[in-house]
Amino acid sequence: MSGGGNLLTLERDHFKYLFLTSYFDLKDNEHVPSEPMAFIRNYLNCTFDLLDDAVLMNYFNYLQSMQLKHLVGSTSTNIFKFVKPQFRFVCDRTTVDILEFDTRMYIKPGTPVYATNLFTSNPRKMMAFLYAEFGKVFKNKIFVNINNYGCVLAGSAGFLFDDAYVDWNGVRMCAAPRLDNNMHPFRLYLLGEDMAKHFVDNNILPPHPSNAKTRKINNSMFMLKNFYKGLPLFKSKYTVVNSTKIVTRKPNDIFNEIDKELNGNCPFIKFIQRDYIFDAQFPPDLLDLLNEYMTKSSIMKIITKFVIEENPAMSGEMSREIILDRYSVDNYRKLYIKMEITNQFPVMYDHESSYIFVSKDFLQLKGTMNAFYAPKQRILSILAVNRLFGATETIDFHPNLLVYRQSSPPVRLTGDVYVVDKNEKVFLVKHVFSNTVPAYLLIRGDYESSSDLKSLRDLNPWVQNTLLKLLIPDSVQ
C-alpha cells in the first residue's frame, strides 16, 4: 500500500507478516497475502528510500511491545539502514568450552555481545573495513587476537563473524551444522560496550564491491537483515483430521494427555516444542499465523509406551499420527493428522531412539535419564539407548531396591552378564522388554553365567555413566 509521496506503507495488522518473513529464514513467501508483499519485499531488499519511515518506527515499536528478547532500543530509523547492534547478549559461559577452533575465538565470561544486522559470505574480505573501525575505538592494540573471522582485544572487546544465531549462554561441546542461510551466512557481532556505542553513534556501511554497478545496500559482498534470528521456517501441510487446544502451565496436564493417548490405540506421539516460544510475548494473531508454519530447528521427541511384561502385540492406528505441539509458553495443540509421506517435521539431529513415557507402573531414579524401578515386579533397569520422559516423581536409588534372590544351585544366566560387585553378588544382565526396548537389569543374588563374565568397561557410555551415578552418586555431577 502506498502513502503520501508514493512511499510504501504497511498496516499494523500486517506487521505479523513482516515479522514472519524477516525474523525467521523463510524461503517461500507464497502463502503471504499479496497486499503486504510490496512493502515486505522492499524491506528485505533494504530499498528504504521507497518505504515510509513512520512505518519502520511503528514496526520497531511493535517489536518492543511484544518484549522481543535481547532487543536493543532505538529512536531512529537508522537502526534499519546502517550497520547497527540490534540484539544484546552477555557471554556467560562459566565452564570450559570444548570448541571447534576454526571460526570461534576466546571471549571472557561477562562480555556483552551485540548481534548486528550485517551479514556476509566472506568475512575475510570485510576485515580491513572493520579493523579500521576498530582502530577508531581502540588505539592500543597490544593484546589483539586476529584471524579471518574477527579481531578480539584481551578477550572482551572487538568484533567477530559467526552464525546468524549463537547461544552465548550455552556450552558448545562439538561442531554443530551451520544452518543454510542463503548467500550470506555470517553475522557480524560486536564485543564490548565501546564497539557497540561506536556503531550506534555513527552511521556506517561497508564499502561496496569494486565491480558493483549500483550502490545497493544488499549486494554480492554483504547485506543487512534487520531483527533477524534466522531460524529456518517451513509451511506445515498436514492433513488435520481433528485438533484440540490445551492451555496450561502444568507439565502434569500434558503428561496426562500423553498417557491417555498411549493407553488408547496410539503406539507413539510426536511431542514438538517450538524453539522460539520464549523469545517474546507474541500477540494472538501472530501466534495463529506461526501455527501455520514450523521451524526445522524446533525440538521433537518421539514418545512411545513402555511395556514391562509380555502382552499381546498392540494394534495401533497406523493411518494417522498424533502431534502434541507446544506453540507458546502455555499453549499446546493436539493434532490428529493423516500419516502421509509428504509430512515434514523438525530435523532430529539427536540420533537417539525414541523416548519412553514414564507410566504409573514404574518410577524414574533420581539423577538419571534412563534408569527406573518397577515396584510390582521388583526390578531395576537401565535403558540401553532410550531416555525416559514424563516423570512426575522420582525416587533415590538404595541398595535395598536390589532384592537378593537365593538359589542353590545358582541360577545360570545366558547372554551378556556384567560383574558390578563380585563380593555383593551384583550383576548387570542384558535384557529386551516385550516391546523390543533394549535394556539391562541390575540384579543381586546367587547367579552364575553360562559364558565369561564381562567387565563394565565393555558397556556403552550411556549405560556406564548411569550405573556410576547410581552406585557412586558423588562421582558424576
Curated annotation (Swiss-Prot):
It is found in: Host cytoplasm; Host nucleus; Virion. InterPro entries: Baculo_Y142. Keywords: Host cytoplasm, Host nucleus, Virion. Transmembrane segments: none annotated. One of its GO terms (cellular component) is host cell nucleus. Required for occlusion-derived virus (ODV) envelopment and subsequent embedding of virions into polyhedra. This is Protein AC142. The lineage of its organism: Viruses, Viruses incertae sedis, Naldaviricetes, Lefavirales, Baculoviridae.
